[in-house]
Swiss-Prot record:
Belongs to the bacterial ribosomal protein bS18 family. It comes from Bradyrhizobium diazoefficiens (strain JCM 10833 / BCRC 13528 / IAM 13628 / NBRC 14792 / USDA 110). SUPFAM superfamilies: Ribosomal protein S18 (SSF46911). Gene3D superfamilies: Ribosomal protein S18. PROSITE patterns: RIBOSOMAL_S18. The gene is rpsR. One of its GO terms (biological process) is translation. This is Small ribosomal subunit protein bS18. Part of the 30S ribosomal subunit. Forms a tight heterodimer with protein bS6. It comes from the Bacteria. GO terms for molecular function: small ribosomal subunit rRNA binding; structural constituent of ribosome.
Length: 79
């Protein structure tokens, strides 16, 4: 039997991917405002375990960020 004061462990519900769904935004290298939400304050790409982006969309996002950096739309390093 379980103790009277024992609680069951808290499980955080998995967030759904912000790029899947009916009215989800498209990942585009020209949309620097959207891409900046997935870049840290130091300029690094934020991992999907923090942003809850699916693996496929994370690869698309990384490709778009790298393309935008190459074209000068996003900085490589933010000081």
């Amino acid at each position: 039997m379980a103790e009277a004061g024992a609680r069951r462990p808290f499980f955080r519900r998995r967030k759904s991917c912000p790029f899947t769904g009916a009215n989800a935004p498209k990942i585009d290298y020209k949309d620097s405002k959207l891409l900046m939400r997935y870049v840290s304050e130091r300029g690094k790409i934020v991992p999907s375990r923090i942003t809850a982006v699916s693996a496929k969309k994370q690869r698309e996002l990384a490709r778009a960020i790298k393309r935008a950096r190459f074209l000068g739309l996003l900085p490589y390093v933010i000081r």
